[in-house]
Amino acid sequence: MNVPDRKKALEAAIAYIEKQFGAGSIMSLGKHSATHEISTIKTGALSLDLALGIGGVPKGRIVEIFGPESSGKTTLATHIVANAQKMGGVAAYIDAEHALDPGYASLIGANINDLMISQPDCGEDALSIAELLARSGAVDVIVIDSVAALVPKSELEGDIGDVHVGLQARMMSQALRKLTATLARSQTCAIFINQIREKIGVSFGNPETTTGGRALKFYSSIRMDIRRIGAIKGNESFDLGNRIKVKVAKNKLAPPFRTAEFDILFNEGISSAGCILDLAVEHNIVEKKGSWFNYQDRKLGQGREAVREELKKNKKLFDELEKRIYDISSASKVVAVEEKKEELKAQPVA
């Protein structure tokens, strides 16, 4: 078959497919990508937005946040909810753990009057509610807190001590098969918060694993491993908050395995001012001499906490530093892309 005949045959096949399944059921990848640019929601931590490579968590995809207890999983998810609301979006929170604190959510910046919340009795109900909300096309982000608390109905109806092998994993696998396509069509971001467990009898390698089987690992576009790495000490004997480290364990949209560090303060959540200060020092925008921090010819203050408070008060300086950090990050991305192009050109053609 020559080229014109092949082209006619392909056009006939495409016309038949569109007649059978509807317009837009098949198209070139170029047209598809032009109409499906990835929209994101900021996480509240600039260092994490940059580590994710796309400026936040993607809409239309599944995101998993996992880690040990008291590591900041719910705080991070609530910040994403608050940022989605600030963009004019609608957020829903499926609280399977029955542990969401409205006061803390409000303190972080979430509008609790507009935040939809569901506390379902079983895992099947929780996942069905998530799918129906996504199918509506009116919700921007859905948080499921947590996978470990999604108890299958048959387990609830049984007695404590009964063995239910693989029930939760089967439930998750079945639900995610339906949910993935619905999320992509409605451009809804689904955030699954997950806990970690330890495998028994693992002598070599990492014994840690997450609950709910393997399906969530496969269907997630981004997986974030969040850990507490230290305490932020106050002037007295009490702690101000925790220092957090996030590793991007999986990323389908940018290079994975990047890490980000930021502060979670007990009275305000993620410290955006602390993030800006750390990144400004890292990129040599702000100079650190001993305990003093200098920006251009100006002394910002002595001690990290004092400068962080100054950035919280001075919105103009905060925005200026943030813009410079974004400019440097964008420039480094362009350089990396150009270097890759040159490298590919230099390779001999087989």
Swiss-Prot record:
Keyword Cytoplasm set for record: yes
One GO CC term, this protein: cytosol
Keyword vocabulary terms for this entry: ATP-binding, Cytoplasm, DNA damage, DNA recombination, DNA repair, DNA-binding, Nucleotide-binding, SOS response
InterPro entries xref list: AAA+_ATPase, DNA_recomb/repair_RecA, DNA_recomb/repair_RecA_CS, P-loop_NTPase, RecA-like_C, RecA-like_N, RecA_ATP-bd, RecA_C_sf
Name the principal localization, coarsely classed: cytoplasm
Single Gene Ontology MF annotation: damaged DNA binding
Subcellular localization is given as: Cytoplasm
Q: Name one GO biological process term.
A: DNA recombination
- Which family does the record claim for this protein? Belongs to the RecA family.
* Name of the protein in question: Protein RecA
